[in-house]
Amino acid sequence: MSRIFSSALQAVFKPSAFLPKTATRSFSILPSLRPATLSSTPSTIFRAPNAITAPSASPSATTGIDGEVLDLLSASSLISSHPALSGLGSQIRCGPRPTMSGATRLVQKRRHGFLSRVKTKNGQKTLKRRLAKGRLRLSA
């Protein structure tokens, strides 16, 4: 009796018994948070009312060959129109920053000096390359 009962329990509690027979993937029908250039009815779900305004563009530049509206915006306008970054849009910089412009000589030595090159693996490679090239100054 216990053997029959245990085999029945094993059949019921198989991992495949809990999984669905077909693997289906469900997609969300929530509105996209990505701003579109030409939207007839902008969705206000999950967005602040002041963050909806997208930069206006000419229709000829935003329509494709088939006449559909393209979702094309520059990177700077995407960042500034993002709801989470609406207050910080003017402060975000997407390029190289002048990190050594106001740095002192001490900071320069700490970042690019000989001891910092010796401590790291890539720094040692840099010193070897400069030594092989014949540089008199191996570091800053």
From Swiss-Prot:
Ribonucleoprotein as UniProt keyword: yes
Cellular localization per UniProt: Mitochondrion
Subunit structure, interactors included: Component of the mitochondrial large ribosomal subunit (mt-LSU). Mature N.crassa 74S mitochondrial ribosomes consist of a small (37S) and a large (54S) subunit. The 37S small subunit contains a 16S ribosomal RNA (16S mt-rRNA) and 32 different proteins. The 54S large subunit contains a 23S rRNA (23S mt-rRNA) and 42 different proteins.
A GO biological process held by the record: translation
Protein task: Component of the mitochondrial ribosome (mitoribosome), a dedicated translation machinery responsible for the synthesis of mitochondrial genome-encoded proteins, including at least some of the essential transmembrane subunits of the mitochondrial respiratory chain. The mitoribosomes are attached to the mitochondrial inner membrane and translation products are cotranslationally integrated into the membrane.
Entry similarity comment: Belongs to the bacterial ribosomal protein bL34 family.
Keywords assigned by UniProt, alphabetized: Mitochondrion, Ribonucleoprotein, Ribosomal protein
Gene3D superfamilies xref list: 1.10.287.3980
Keyword Ribonucleoprotein: yes
Transmembrane segments: none
Superkingdom, natural source: Eukaryota
UniProt gene name: mrpl34
A molecular-function term among this protein's GO annotations: structural constituent of ribosome
Protein name, as recorded: Large ribosomal subunit protein bL34m
Gene Ontology CC entries for this record: mitochondrial large ribosomal subunit
Chief place of localization: mitochondrion
Source organism (scientific name): Neurospora crassa (strain ATCC 24698 / 74-OR23-1A / CBS 708.71 / DSM 1257 / FGSC 987)
